[in-house]
Every structure is written in C-alpha cells, then in structure tokens.
C-alpha cells in the first residue's frame, strides 16, 4: 500500500519545503495543496534551473504526478493564470497535471485592495501581510459571504452574489479607508472570462483522493507558510489566516485524518522570519548578517529581506506536539559553515527570572522572553552538497544529534544545497 505523507514547515515559513516536495514527488502520484494561497513562495532548483511557485503544487514539474489545489486554498484566478502561463512557456503541460476543488474560495481584486488599505492604516503596527488578499478572502469564507470557484459556473447567480459582496467591501474601502472603490463590471467580466477554463480542471477532490488511497497510490500533502504562522497556534496576531499545521490537511482537502501515515517537518538549521512579529532568537549582529547573506534570505513571494536568528528548540518542540511530526528534514545546514560556534535556544527566561520550555500563547508573551542558549562548537569545513552523513564534519554531526535529542524526533533528511541532488535521505517518508 502507498503511504500518505504530509510535508509542512515548522518555523515561520521559508524552510525549503518546495525543494523537498519536488524531491519526494518522485515517489508520489498526487501532490495536494490544502491551505494558503499565492502568498506562498516555493522555490525549486533542478539542474541549476530555478522555478518559483506560489499557488500550484510543487509536483507540477513531474510528468507522473497529478497536482491538486484543495478546498482550503484561497484561489486568485489572475495569479493562477500567470503561473500557468509561466509554466506553459517552459513546456509544462499544466492542464494535464493540475486539478482544482470547486470549493476553493476566490480571491478577487477587492480582497487585495482591502489587504493593502488595512496594512497602510495600521502604520507601524502593520502585520506584514503580502498584500495579496489572503486574509480578506478567508474572512469572507468564515462570514459565509465568500464566492467560490464553483460559483463561476452559474454566471447569473455569480453576478448577483458578487454585486452584494462588493457593495459591502467597496463601502469599507471608500468610507472607512478613504481609497478608491473596485470596479464591479471589470471584476465580473475578468472572473467570468476564466469560468470555462477553470471548470475543465475541477474535480471532486475528496472522492479522487479516497479512491487513490484505496488503490494504494501514494499521496503527498504540501503545506505552505509554517507552524509558527498558524492562525490558532502561531504568534498571534502576527500570523497568516489559515491552519498551516497538520490538522489543516483534513479540513483543507477532505482527506480523512486517520489515513495520514507520516508528517515530515521542514526545519532550517537556523531560523528566519519575514515581516513583523516577535522573534526571540533574532540576531541583529554580524552572525545574523552572515546567515542572511550566505542563506540568500529574501522572500520568494515579496522579495523582502528575512530576519535571521539561531535555531529555537522551544518553538520546534511545540511544532512537534501540534503536528505529530514523524521526522524532520533539516535544511540549509551549509549556511552554518564557517561559524566558530553555533547556538540552540533551549529555554525562555521570563521577566521574573523563571525559565520555561514551552511557548507563550501569543505575540505579547514572546516579546517578553529572553532566549536561553546552549552553545556548541562550529565547523570550518564545507558541508555544501554533501550526500552522505559520513561526509559531514564531526561538529556538524554533533549539532544534528543534539537537535534530535532536544526534539525527541529523528532528522530523516538533510539538505546541503538548493539543488534536488544536494540532499541526503537517511529515511524516506514513503518507505
């Protein structure tokens, strides 16, 4: 029987999920996105050729894989078309490989307009969203006024629903945020123009995945963002608007949770964060500059510079608990090459002097703690491109083993470079 594997980020996103999903899809028949939208940025490097995907699952470059956008994903038709056209220009037969749930909420121009207006109004209290309308689209879904992909297939009803929801949002844009309204006729025309094309790719995702499971076909679920950005379990309110954790797989795809076999947590050998929000182990020093420069830490979606810091084992321990992580993939180990010492945060010191090994409830709690570090020797040798554990310097192996001890979870895969083949798979999630 085939295994059903979840790949998700355990930090604040940007852990290197895209590369690992692409690598593992060699053994998968289906790759499923189950949450988020085109705020994700998954970078694949194959034989030096770089591809950045925001909405389409990372298995799209494999000719043996069907890629599915599940109901938990908020879908911007214009962003999807841009990505499809980019791939088609490179000779990828997207229509043969991509399938979409009719239940995906739509992101429309007024969602992006609201997102941008809100961030501007917040001033120095901005959340740091991508401005792509993700949050407002999820709000409409929860408020039961959102439009979904399937609504496009009844033009008259879609027009009626769109008029109602746009009247509401345009009032907010013009009267509260004092910005221009979004044009209804243009929004309607642009959306309906893609209706037939999108309909040709729509399927009953729950039925499809359940049949695949019964047939023993391996399925890979691809998470976006990271655990610490989860709407419920992250550094609230500096979070995304979806459940980025393993529990989101079932709700965002319609796949039964009892049938998930393995959860692979992707974790950098250090930590980064994009945008605003608390970050206990952030390094505002030369070491931070080293990590940011050597790790090419710029967001794949926004281009924003990422904030680097040491690995936070306290936060990673919570990620293990929330996600039932079976094993980790440690990425960007090579970025630590050349450092005299490396540190791991093993506790949080609170203002009253007490030390805890659990994460606070929300952002305010994170902002009050000071990291307690364990220091280990660094290594001068290069780990870049290593494909066998024996090729690593002993100090790097010791660092890996210490992480495993602290998290009580094995590191099953180690990434030592951006390319597909710069990876050592110690234990395959599908085996």
UniProtKB/Swiss-Prot annotation:
Cofactor note: Binds 1 Mg(2+) ion per subunit.
Annotated residues for binding of IMP: 14-17, 39-42, 130, 144, 225, 240, 304
Subcellular compartments: Cytoplasm
Any GO molecular function: GTP binding
Binding site for Mg(2+): 14, 41
EC category name: ligase
GO cellular component, one term: cytoplasm
SUPFAM superfamilies in alphabetical order: P-loop containing nucleoside triphosphate hydrolases (SSF52540)
Binding site residues for GTP: 13-19, 41-43, 306, 332-334, 415-417
Record keywords, A-Z: Cytoplasm, GTP-binding, Ligase, Magnesium, Metal-binding, Nucleotide-binding, Purine biosynthesis
Known catalytic reactions: IMP + L-aspartate + GTP = N(6)-(1,2-dicarboxyethyl)-AMP + GDP + phosphate + 2 H(+)
InterPro entries: Adenylosuccin_syn_GTP-bd, Adenylosuccin_syn_Lys_AS, Adenylosuccinate_synth_dom1, Adenylosuccinate_synth_dom2, Adenylosuccinate_synth_dom3, Adenylosuccinate_synthetase, P-loop_NTPase
Residues in the signal sequence: none
Required co-factors: Mg(2+)
Enzyme nomenclature, EC number: 6.3.4.4
Superkingdom of source: Bacteria
Any GO BP annotation: IMP metabolic process
Active-site feature positions: 14 (proton acceptor), 42 (proton donor)
Pathway linked to the protein: Purine metabolism; AMP biosynthesis via de novo pathway; AMP from IMP: step 1/2
Keyword Membrane tagged: no
Binding of substrate, residues: 300-306
Family: Belongs to the adenylosuccinate synthetase family.
Role description: Plays an important role in the de novo pathway of purine nucleotide biosynthesis. Catalyzes the first committed step in the biosynthesis of AMP from IMP.
Designated name of the protein: Adenylosuccinate synthetase
Gene: purA
